[in-house]
Swiss-Prot record:
InterPro entries: HemC, Porphobilin_deaminase_cofac_BS, Porphobilin_deaminase_N, Porphobilinogen_deaminase_C, Porphobilinogen_deaminase_C_sf. Belongs to the HMBS family. GO terms for molecular function: hydroxymethylbilane synthase activity. HAMAP family: Porphobil_deam. Monomer. GO terms for cellular component: cytoplasm. It comes from Pseudomonas putida (strain W619). This is Porphobilinogen deaminase.
Length: 313
C-alpha cells in the first residue's frame, strides 16, 4: 500500500485532542512511515456552552463541522466519542472503526463526600445529562440537580469553586486526561447505566475511501464494536439521536451479548428497564428487541415529553 498522509479532523477540547492523538499514535504504530496530522476545529457544541444540550439540538452539534471537513476533503478521518455520534450519517460518510473501550462507567467526583449515598439531603449535584439526572433522582429524590456544561477542566474547576457538592462525569474522560485521582467513586452500571457507546472512540471517514478503511482495520476492536452496535441499535429504534434520558449497556458473555436498556423521566419519577441476550452476530436485532420492550412499557410517552420540552420533534 502506498504511503500517504492521513488528516484527522478533531474538536479542540482537551479530551477530543487526546482521542485524536491516541488514534494518530495507533496509526503510526500500525503503519510505520505513515504521515498523520491533526486538523483541529471548533464545533458548534463547543461554542454554545450556556444552554442544555437537549435544548440546542443534542450531541450532533459536536460532529457536524467535522463531517463537513470530510465531505470537503479537508480531512480524511474524524475521531469521535461514540456517545456523541448521531445514529445516521450524511451520504458518503460512515463509521469504519471502533477502538477498544475504556471504563464505561459514570464517575462520582466530590471534594467532601465519599459516595452518592454519603451526600446529605439537598446536596447540589452537577451534570449535563438527562440520563444521569433521571437515574440519580430515582435513587436520591432528595438531591438538587444543577445544570453543568463545559470541558472536563471547567467542570472540575466549578466543583472546586464550591458551586456543587458533587459532579457526575464519564470515568473514561477523567482517566484519559490524567484525572483518575479525582474519581471519588466509580458508579456501578447497576446504579447508573451508561450512555450508548460511552467510553469508546469511533472513527468516521468517507465510504468510498477503501485505502483509509484498510489503514484503520488494525485499530478496530471487534468485542467493543459488537457491544456498541447493540447499544446504538437500541438508541436508533427509540429515535435517541437527541440528548434524552436513554441508557444502554451491552456486555459479552462468551459469544453471547447481554444488553440492558433504560428510559427514564428526567424527574426520576419513572424508570423503565429491559434486558435480553442474543448471539453477538445478532447485535443489531438485540438492540431493536430491547428497545421494543421499552416501547411496550411506555417509553414513547416519556421521550415525547422530553422532546417537547427541548423543542424538538
Amino acid at each position: 500500500m502506498s504511503t500517504r498522509e492521513i488528516r484527522i479532523a478533531t474538536r479542540k477540547s482537551a479530551l477530543a485532542l487526546w482521542q485524536a492523538e491516541y488514534v494518530k499514535a495507533r496509526l503510526e504504530q500500525a503503519h510505520p512511515g505513515l504521515l498523520v496530522t491533526l486538523v483541529p476545529m471548533v464545533s458548534r457544541g463547543d461554542k454554545l456552552l450556556d444552554a442544555p444540550l437537549a435544548k440546542i439540538g443534542g450531541k450532533g452539534l459536536f460532529v457536524k463541522e467535522l463531517e463537513t471537513a470530510l465531505l470537503d476533503n479537508e480531512a480524511d478521518i474524524a475521531v469521535h466519542s461514540m456517545k456523541d455520534v448521531p445514529m445516521d450519517f450524511p451520504e458518503g460518510l460512515g463509521l469504519y472503526c471502533i477502538c477498544e473501550r475504556e471504563d464505561p462507567r459514570d464517575a462520582f467526583v466530590s471534594n467532601r463526600f465519599s459516595s452518592l449515598d454519603a451526600l446529605p439531603a439537598g446536596s447540589i449535584v452537577g451534570t449535563s445529562s438527562l440520563r444521569r439526572q433521571a437515574q440519580l433522582l430515582a435513587r436520591r429524590p432528595d438531591l438538587q440537580i444543577r445544570f453543568l456544561r463545559g470541558n472536563v477542566n471547567t467542570r472540575l474547576a466549578k466543583l472546586d469553586a464550591g458551586e456543587y457538592d458533587a459532579i457526575i462525569l464519564a470515568a473514561a474522560g477523567l482517566i484519559r486526561l490524567g484525572f483518575e485521582e479525582r474519581i471519588t467513586a466509580s458508579i456501578s452500571v447497576d446504579d447508573s447505566l451508561p450512555a450508548g457507546g460511552q467510553g469508546a472512540v469511533g472513527i468516521e471517514c468517507r465510504s468510498a475511501d477503501s485505502e483509509i478503511h484498510a489503514l484503520l482495520a488494525p485499530l478496530h476492536h471487534t468485542d467493543t464494536a459488537d457491544r456498541v452496535v447493540a447499544e446504538r441499535a437500541l438508541n436508533k429504534h427509540l429515535n435517541g439521536g437527541c440528548q434524552v434520558p436513554i441508557a444502554c449497556y451491552a456486555v459479552l458473555e462468551g459469544e453471547q451479548l447481554w444488553l440492558r436498556g433504560l428510559v427514564g423521566q428526567p424527574s426520576g419519577g419513572t424508570l423503565l428497564m429491559a434486558d435480553a441476550r442474543a448471539p453477538r452476530a445478532s447485535a443489531e436485532t438485540l438492540g431493536v428487541q430491547v428497545a421494543e420492550d421499552l416501547l411496550g412499557q411506555g417509553a414513547a410517552a416519556i421521550l415525547k415529553e422530553v422532546y417537547g420540552e427541548a423543542g424538538h420533534p
